[in-house]
């Protein structure tokens, strides 16, 4: 009986020893998960602690934001209300204006609050949501600008068949595909970025949650994330810019065949406006993302990010409408109705 009891105790001791080994082995996997949940919020430090400068920046960016909303949403209303603007070219322009309004709204309100608030924190989920929307709208705009370039080519190459060539069966899928591409691209980066461990500093040297500064503060190996960022952003930039350039080349060939000076001027104006918008937008994206996240530290980088998230959405209505006679006529007509 004693020997049986002793054997039973030895068996229990062996089981306990093996369970302890298994538990210590699982700790290897538990610790990274624990580290990931240590940071529950981030601090958006911005680029200045000077209160007087922050007040000035608040007033400046608040004014820019108001102009952005008025310009872009006003253009959307204009396209909806004016029957002369009911064609694919202006539908694309209204979608771009809506995107710019959303793009700016994702970033600007939180930034304005942080200029005057002592607590500049943003929750983990809030940061992920802001980044998801920001990348979605940004990527969608890249593809939409490419679709608009193709639309301009169709309009200039054969204007008589434009309404047939660019029917709802064509332009609606182009717009939808742009949004789908934006959502997929954003989802990939959100999953990759927020699967990392953030167990050290929670201070993001930025005015909003963006990928490079987040990767810079992660305590995980971010090599894969940086490759994803480089290859995905690089591929999207190459594809969309090529579509724009090829479309513009065909537009120029079509312009050279035109006999009407008025037609040439209108075509040059349309193509020139679009190239200006594309160059400014894609140029700032390339500067911001096509380099290692470790080099992301200077105020210059923050200013570039602010430019393409806040300033460009304000400029787009001016770029695409300033030399557009149809839009000018529609604006004058609406102002007459308002002040009649």
Swiss-Prot record:
> Between which residues do disulfide bridges form?
127-219
Claim: Cell membrane is one of the keywords in the record: yes
Annotated GO biological processes are: G protein-coupled receptor signaling pathway; sensory perception of smell
Which residues are sugar-modified? 35, 119
Q: Which InterPro entries match?
A: GPCR_Rhodpsn (IPR000276), GPCR_Rhodpsn_7TM (IPR017452), Olfact_rcpt (IPR000725)
Domain of life according to the entry: Eukaryota
**Hey, which stretches end up on the Cytoplasmic side?**
77-84, 151-169, 248-267, 323-340
Tell me how this protein sits in the membrane: Multi-pass membrane protein
**Which cellular component, as a GO term, is one annotated location?**
plasma membrane
Q: Keywords for this entry?
A: Cell membrane, Disulfide bond, G-protein coupled receptor, Glycoprotein, Membrane, Olfaction, Receptor, Sensory transduction, Transducer, Transmembrane, Transmembrane helix
Single annotated GO MF: olfactory receptor activity
**Main localization of the protein described in the UniProt heading:** membrane
- TM helices/strands, residue ranges: 56-76, 85-105, 130-150, 170-190, 227-247, 268-288, 302-322
Q: Where in the cell is it found?
A: Cell membrane
* Gene3D superfamilies the record matches: Rhodopsin 7-helix transmembrane proteins
**Stretches in topological domain Extracellular:** 1-55, 106-129, 191-226, 289-301
Q: What does this protein do?
A: Odorant receptor.
Protein name, UniProt field: Olfactory receptor 5T3
